[in-house]
């Protein structure tokens, strides 16, 4: 759950670090997420991205939504077998400051949501 955040109230260090990481993206929309991190939404090369920064300006992660067909085939196969009874809610490509690049697949079954994080190889990391 996030709420619209006025750009004037985003800490200067957060804006500076966003601008350093994404120098050509000067007009993001800012939200604050459930963890009190600042989320910048912006478009780059026609793709919508969300970049999260802590209140002290540290970059946490950048993510964008993709379709199942855009997942590596090995991950599609795992979803089709191991999670065949689940419905896919959302799929994201994520680059995280600690975990590096991975795919976050949010699935649901009987009202219970869970995230499964995959490396490109298909290894599950959470």
Where are the predicted features?
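Exposed beta-strand-loop-beta-strand "reactive/processing" segments of non-cytosolic proteins
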Residues: 26-50, 99-115
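Hydrophobic/anchoring residues in structured secondary elements
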Residues: 30-32, 64, 91-93
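Bacterial Sec-dependent N-terminal signal peptides
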Residues: 1-10, 18
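Flexible "stalk/tail and boundary" regions
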Residues: 5, 80-81, 86-96, 100-103, ...
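A short, surface-exposed beta-strand/turn
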Residues: 49-60, 114-126
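Long, charged/polar, surface-exposed segments that mediate recognition or autoinhibition
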Residues: 58-85
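Post-signal peptide N-terminal segment of mature Sec-exported envelope proteins
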Residues: 12-28
């Amino acid at each position: 759950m996030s709420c619209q955040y006025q750009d004037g109230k985003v800490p200067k260090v957060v804006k500076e670090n966003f601008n350093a990481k994404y120098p050509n993206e000067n007009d993001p929309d800012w939200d604050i997420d459930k963890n009190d991190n600042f989320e910048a939404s912006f478009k780059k090369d026609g793709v919508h991205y969300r970049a999260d920064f802590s209140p002290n300006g540290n970059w946490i992660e950048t993510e964008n939504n993709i379709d199942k067909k855009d997942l590596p085939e090995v991950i599609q196969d795992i979803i089709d077998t191991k999670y065949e009874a689940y419905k896919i809610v959302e799929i994201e490509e994520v680059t995280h400051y600690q975990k590096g690049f991975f795919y976050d697949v949010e699935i649901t079954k009987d009202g219970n949501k869970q995230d499964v994080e995959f490396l490109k190889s298909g290894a599950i990391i959470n």
